[in-house]
């Protein structure tokens, strides 16, 4: 009787540990997926910075006031940079 009880408790403990480990792996995989767009956004930010500053520099060479290039998607050109509004 004691052996059966020990076997049942052991199986229950293994099941709990296995479930916990599976949940941790799933959470880690979701964190990795969430982190991926950040690197893509950084590349977009660099492109916006470059486009905005180049646009202003070209207009300054023509002895005109810098009409800053419009940055789209909640961004605006300020100090030759696209900044988040």
UniProtKB/Swiss-Prot annotation:
Any single GO CC term annotated in Swiss-Prot or TrEMBL for this entry: extracellular region
One Pfam family from the record: Toxin_20
Molecular function in Gene Ontology: toxin activity
Location in or out of the cell: Secreted
Keyword Glycoprotein tagged: no
Disulfide topology: 52-66, 56-77, 71-82
Expression by tissue: Expressed by the venom gland.
Keyword annotations: Disulfide bond, Neurotoxin, Postsynaptic neurotoxin, Secreted, Signal, Toxin
Signal peptide extent: 1-22
Maturation-removed propeptide residues: 23-48
UniProt keyword annotation of Lyase present: no
Task of the protein: Postsynaptic neurotoxin.
Family according to the record: Belongs to the neurotoxin 12 (Hwtx-2) family. 02 (Hwtx-2) subfamily.
Protein name: U4-theraphotoxin-Hhn1m
Lineage: Eukaryota, Metazoa, Ecdysozoa, Arthropoda, Chelicerata
């Amino acid at each position: 009787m004691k052996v059966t009880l020990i076997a049942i408790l052991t199986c229950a403990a293994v099941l709990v540990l296995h479930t916990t480990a599976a949940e941790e792996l799933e959470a880690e995989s979701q964190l990795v997926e969430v982190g991926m767009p950040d690197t893509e956004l950084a590349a977009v930010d660099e492109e916006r910075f470059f486009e905005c500053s180049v646009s202003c520099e070209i207009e300054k060479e023509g002895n005109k006031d810098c009409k800053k290039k419009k940055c789209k998607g909640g961004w605006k050109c300020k100090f030759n940079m696209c900044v988040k509004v």
